[in-house]
């Protein structure tokens, strides 16, 4: 098995995992965050959120300066000490937010798909949808390489929409609350592998990895982890991995940050 004393990276989703889906509370996870920080174990946030949102949350959680994965892997925010790496401070995968928006506007105009993007509304509306403050809601609109939307059409039309996006080199991904469109080449798994390889190159040893997530869009991330915690979530589809060996994967009984704490307790408390 493994311990927090060895080279280790922890990758964590946010909403529904480290943060409560409704209140955004993270206090149940605070003791473990402190313990990992004291052991110099990087906790790498990985989410559909924008880098602007996540940098704010990093500071709140005491994780500032560490790398993070934003917009479902389309954006990698580099660690503060990685200034010599090409692309610092952020690496963008695939086409830009503006280019994706143009594609979506064309599809909506010509093929009459029904959806509302975050670009279609103001921060007050997003605050109503999410329960965030207006200042935090404004950060959700600062996309760099994806578009977030609410789907307002039928399941049949969604299948057609997804197929059209795939033809255009894009993917349609379900999050905890919203849907996301990003380049087909981007993903949480590719971003995580890049970060793991960078730590390995800098230290000379591949770190052991632990990932935590609660939704279907976390599955690619958890697949490439050495160990995985599937936090009990609200999504009816859940998370299904190809390798669910119980020595590698733990499914929690609790939701959100309490489940996050439960997962860390399972893998580390007895060690």
Swiss-Prot record:
Mg(2+) binds at residues 13, 15, 214. Its main location: cytoplasm. Its cofactor is Mg(2+). It is found in: Cytoplasm. It is an enzyme of class 3 (hydrolase). One of its GO terms (molecular function) is mannosyl-3-phosphoglycerate phosphatase activity. Disulfide bonds: none annotated. CDD domains: HAD_Pase. The keyword Mitochondrion does not apply. It holds the Pfam family Hydrolase_3. GO terms for cellular component: cytosol. The active site is at residue 13. It catalyses: 2-O-(alpha-D-mannosyl)-3-phosphoglycerate + H2O = (2R)-2-O-(alpha-D-mannosyl)-glycerate + phosphate. Its EC number is 3.1.3.70. InterPro entries: HAD-like_sf (IPR036412), HAD-SF-IIB-MPGP (IPR006381), HAD-SF_hydro_IIB (IPR006379), HAD_sf (IPR023214), MPG_Pase (IPR012815). Keywords: Cytoplasm, Hydrolase, Magnesium, Metal-binding. One of its GO terms (biological process) is mannosylglycerate biosynthetic process. Belongs to the HAD-like hydrolase superfamily. MPGP family. NCBIfam families: HAD-SF-IIB, HAD-SF-IIB-MPGP, MPGP_rel, PRK03669.1. This is Mannosyl-3-phosphoglycerate phosphatase. It comes from Escherichia coli O139:H28 (strain E24377A / ETEC).
